[in-house]
Amino acid sequence: MASRSFSADGSDPQGLAVTSFLLLVKVSWRNVWRNPRGTLLTALALGLGLALLLISLGLLDGGHEQTIANGVRFGPGHVVIQAKGFQDSGSQELLLPARVVSTINEFLQTEPMKRVLLGVSPRLLATGLLSSAANSAGVTIIGVIPREERAVSLIPQRMVAGKYLSDDNPAGIVIGAEVARKLEVKIGSKVVLMTQAVRQPGTKVKDVTPGEMQSTLLRVNGIFRTGIEGVDANVIHLPLSVAQTLLGVPDQQVTQVALFLRQEGDSLMVAKGLRRQLAAAPVEVLTWRESMPMLAQILGLDHAFNYVMNGVVLAMVGLGILNTILMRVLERRYEFGVCKALGLRPVQLAVMIIGESLALTAMSLAFGLALGLSIDHYFATSGLDLRLLFRTSLPSTIVLDPILYSRLSVSRIVSSVIIVFIMATVISFYPALKAARTELPDALKVL
């Protein structure tokens, strides 16, 4: 049997230590409720701070998730493969070789890629002039495969008049609402699209001279409105085959292949795999952060701003807690003097104050979690209608749906609780030190 040591008077030191600790815990809990009003107000302040932190983080992550999703679906996708140098120059002369497009298609058919891939959209990009009987407008031409584009892009979902492109209507074109307003056209109107033909060396295309101006007659099939000025006033979609014929590009060649993934977090992995597969080809494989650096920078700045604001809120809550606990300590100097006179050591006094703070923090965290998660659940299911904040419509620079949904992860919840708990614990050290250093003569002067 294990032996236990006893002191000279027959007492058990370990048992006394445990009893003393439990007694301090009991006293700390009772002290918390000596001033119920102050306790509840402090718990309310700290709980509201945690709830506000959880709500803001949930809406922040949800907003960023929606912004990224909309950005990539209005833009070049989560991952884009294009000719080397196209990102910097934007030259319509830079096309993906047919063999590269074939290699990409083979790679995308592998089992690992099928699991992460949502859709693929080959695109041919160029600039041109769109004219009607009333006016003309410079536009960005995007040749797409209607079936593929409809599955991944948001533009087919933002039609305000007419319908999106279809395979059985090769002469159809869809244009932005601002383009339609400038050209004074409506559904069914005839427009002429003019652009400069391109041709890669060594290719045989229909009678098209490189650099020659080409034009074609099209009919407005649909009008879309995205809320993004740069898209609505500039972008037009037409069938890929029509764009290839107009530009004198072989059927197998496109400007870029846009990949859309089920999870944004897989972007880097997919990009690395494609870079290995296409290492010898004159192409560049970019994630959305590289193809849309402005969007990535805006999200980064928004993250930083929100962290600063959350830090300010927590600092204000922390100062309030410090003030409350410190006032409690100063009001109880006589009590601490009596405790010291009865033999309570400074360390035990400090432990008692820290125990009070931890008990108060535990109650605050429970309240904050209940309140924060309840409100977050509402925002996650019903969403926050941003139109209530902007009265009418969203600013054209915001790439968001009108309804913002919260996305609060478990890691965010755990980290928030840990941060608030550590903050409250550290704050309690100074009042505890103040109580431990109470001098008996000074404490009795309170009388």
Regions found by a protein language model. Name each.
Residues 403-447:
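C-terminal membrane-exit region of the final transmembrane helix in multipass inner-membrane proteins
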Residues 36-63, 300-334, 358-371, 418-426:
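Hydrophobic alpha-helical transmembrane segments of multi-pass inner-membrane transport and secretion
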